Amino acid sequence: MEQSSEVGSNLGSWDHKRDGSVRSGIKLSRAITISANFTQNLSTTRNSTGLEQMSMTRDYVAYGELLNEGLPFPGWSFRLTGLEKWPIIKRFAKSASMEHSFSGKETRSWQFEDGSPEQMNFFSFGTFASEYKDNERSSRINQNFSPLIGLNLTLKKNISLTFRNNMSKSLDETPTGLTIQNDNSYTSTGTYTHRGGMNIPVPFYGTLNLNNTISFTLNFDLNESREERSGDKINLEVGSFSESWKTGLRMSYQFSTKVSGGVRYEYRESDTRTTGKKVDRDFGFDVNLAISG
């Protein structure tokens, strides 16, 4: 009997992953807290035909119009409390704090037809990426400020205010070109709450005590998004863009533990490259009754 030449040729697949991370945090004072985190992941997969795929993800800080410069660097977060003690803020705020956070990632993948000539390691990745650029199949670099700046204020007379500005930028690159995405958003919320009550005389019952809570919430959101593309990886052209903003007011009330409701109104505007300008308005109300038997 003739033996097939394919017998025993399927060697299966091989998968290897290496992960490393470092975390640190420090409290400089009762009001200042800083934390940092760095993570790097390496992955290698080889199938039975000898095709090898490698990928790497690590924390990264990029700069330049095309995010083509940068260095491995940990993400960080920063929080500052006690701003209500500052000379101007203490005049109107009962409590105040500020936040800031950054995270950036670099992700790359390669493909080798007959196996890679060498293995990546944590300390010489830059040399590996430069030497085998022709084998690179995709890369992504993104940086995210979430928030770039965030403020939390509690004012007198039960008024609270929040503000957030988030920014992100990403670069996706393939052998055929690259895409850059820019996003920017502003979010603010103001809330006023009043708690009170009333006494209503009821015949043959006595006095009926009604405790009520009324709150007013005002929101404002602004979002901007812009995509740029380049086939030659040098000259950029706008691919798509969108801008939108909305504001809304909601009044909520609670007359007792069994009766609550609210009224809301929202106005929205948006403008995109494909659909143009659009305006929406929304009005509604709700009533909630708790019935128990």
Task: List PLM regions with ranges.
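Exposed, low-structure sequence patches enriched in small/polar residues
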Residues: 1-293
